Amino acid sequence: MSWDQVWIDVNVATMDPSISAPYGAITHAAIAVKDGKIAWLGPRSELPAFDVLSIPVYRGKGGWITPGLIDAHTHLVFAGNRANEFELRLKGATYEEIARAGGGIISTVNACREADEAALFELGRQRLNALAKEGVTTVEIKSGYGLDTETELKILRVARELGKHHHVDVKTTFLGAHAVPPEYKGNSDGYVDLIINKMLPAVIKENLADAVDVFCENIAFNLEQTERVLSAAKAAGLQVKLHAEQLSNMGGSELAARLGAKSVDHIEYLDEAGVKALSESGTCAVLLPGAFYFLRETQKPPIDLLRQYGVPMVLASDFNPGSFPICSTLLMLNMGCTLFRLTPEEALAGLTLNAAKALGIEDKVGSLVVGKQADFCLWNIATPAQLAYSYGVNPCKDVVKNGKLVHQ
């Protein structure tokens, strides 16, 4: 057989739902890669003969291979920090109180408006490197810290450049509707007009976004405004998604389902009607345990209802300067299990196959199947559950991206 590389002495958590074993596991397995894709996958005993002297053969020493991790919700490109707000919250101030007083998102907006693209790129590169070392091979990056045309474009350009200069694939999301900027205080409808009539066309002209997002919440944008932005995005051929039901239930999830959104994110206050709507539309539920933890929230997402209705559950870091400034995707496995009571298998699916669904790329990545992109990680673990069970010593040994060994 003519392959580019072969991996043997491994166990594989394929996350392929057509395999009935937990994690879609194949033990004592082998993987062959050709032209950046998985060319063969199965038990080592069934691997066709090949010339071991002509291609690289990697021995996994009994470790586990999983699909490359996918972080489907980050705000990775930003300047400044909000450590002072961290102190205020610990003294009793709420996230909403800080935002209404001009802190929160707006303080980061001011820092991003002042930063140039080179500075933002370097900050983003360092953060992307940190995620890559944890086995992340695809990441979504949102804008939303500009809130004017120039800075929103600047953030999205930086995100696109990161994808061009890093082995991690970057999917970009335009989140101009993240908050109402100070210059539009008391005129949120006017700002929505700006998003639709000026910002979005500029984003589309430069091909800077794969999707459009809106923060649908009392402190941000109402249902009517949210629908206006997302409808304009859909009309332009972009995917849509939504921050919703984080602080209250405004019915954003039902709106997202009606619009065919790829995902609804946060959803702590999601009710059964919203869950049913997501199930019927095939919209993913993105769980963000890091923000739940960091903000010391008490309202948990309706995990049992999501299971009951078969809604794909995604885990993501929500890495951002305000509600989760901890740059770790791997930590979400443990948090998803301990805080939201996911099983380790559900948690891993949330960072692989279901995360790919949330980004609309499940035909290429998210599970290990012949013909899909060869994005995978070798972990120094005895069982896949160990990824969720333990944290602190990074067990990621090797990372393959598009068939190339990029981290060893």
Curated annotation (Swiss-Prot):
It comes from Shewanella oneidensis (strain ATCC 700550 / JCM 31522 / CIP 106686 / LMG 19005 / NCIMB 14063 / MR-1). Keywords: Cytoplasm, Histidine metabolism, Hydrolase, Iron, Metal-binding, Zinc. NCBIfam families: hutI. Gene3D superfamilies: Metal-dependent hydrolases, Urease, subunit C, domain 1. This is Imidazolonepropionase. N-formimidoyl-L-glutamate binds at residues 145, 320, 322. It is found in: Cytoplasm. Zn(2+) binds at residues 73, 75, 243, 318. GO terms for cellular component: cytoplasm. GO terms for molecular function: imidazolonepropionase activity; iron ion binding; zinc ion binding. It is an enzyme of class 3 (hydrolase). Binds 1 zinc or iron ion per subunit. The keyword Zinc applies. One of its GO terms (biological process) is L-histidine catabolic process to glutamate and formate. Pathway: Amino-acid degradation; L-histidine degradation into L-glutamate; N-formimidoyl-L-glutamate from L-histidine: step 3/3.
